[in-house]
Amino acid sequence: MIRKSATGVIVALAVIWGGGTWYTGTQIQPGVEKFIKDFNDAKKKGEHAYDMTLSYQNFDKGFFNSRFQMQMTFDNGAPDLNIKPGQKVVFDVDVEHGPLPITMLMHGNVIPALAAAKVNLVNNELTQPLFIAAKNKSPVEATLRFAFGGSFSTTLDVAPAEYGKFSFGEGQFTFNGDGSSLSNLDIEGKVEDIVLQLSPMNKVTAKSFTIDSLARLEEKKFPVGESESKFNQINIINHGEDVAQIDAFVAKTMLDRVKDKDYINVNLTYELDKLTKGNQQLGSGEWSLIAESIDPSAVRQFIIQYNIAMQKQLAAHPELANDEVALQEVNAALFKEYLPLLQKSEPTIKQPVKWKNALGE
């Protein structure tokens, strides 16, 4: 009797799992299409820095898995990035259907999920330099998990790579979002062994780079939160000898909403922690840019109008991509033209600077 009961339970679970897997599998393609539509609608509104179109192809839906390719096409190219019109960034996507994706079960995770996915960058004309820099390994690989409530988590693994004079070791970043909104996002990450070769005899190294960010969007228009990016244990090296050391270089951003008002305050802070030259400790410093009472709607309009104008300039004058001075002049002219949009809220700007010696004075 016990054996029959156990068999019945197993059969029931198999039916439930199979039915759930079939159902969640039917939700993948509509979800992909909605994501693409939202992305392309944002392009039409001028919210992207470049004229890009998102699409998918080769959708193959199985019972436990769905596979397809996601591709982002630069319609008019990106001259400042040496991207030609029509070039694409392509991703191979392998989705495991919920409610219990097999890979997650193999790792002991029995929490039901809508789907889990593996995303890999495709080696093509545009992305080939990334694969060469990573010594023919995939430069980035992503693992995603989508919950039934709309939240998601992503782990991004970064391969060691060397891009000319800049190199780094392996790294990993995690992204956790609420309601499938990239505006409500927690980010943590770390990359090891960073090297910037300034010349054959001079270089700057950092033991690691870390990032910790928590951001959300209130009422769909007020960005708030804080982030911290840090280069740890920096060494400035000349002819093989350490010239100076810095315990950490930190960049912090804080955004908070002004109470009972449609404004936000922004605080950008850069910190230099424990600068040492030879045997001499020179202290620590801090520089901040504080902007109070900023209208986020005005900032959004500024970015949109600026992006649209810059896209038109680059499309009409592709030679700007190879003329840094001319490009800076265009940037300055566009910034001046659309600056009145930012000045609607009449923000208050402060730039405090602090420095303490080794004695804390």
What are these regions (language model features)?
Residues 4-8, 16-361:
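Glycine-rich, small/hydroxylated-residue low-complexity segments
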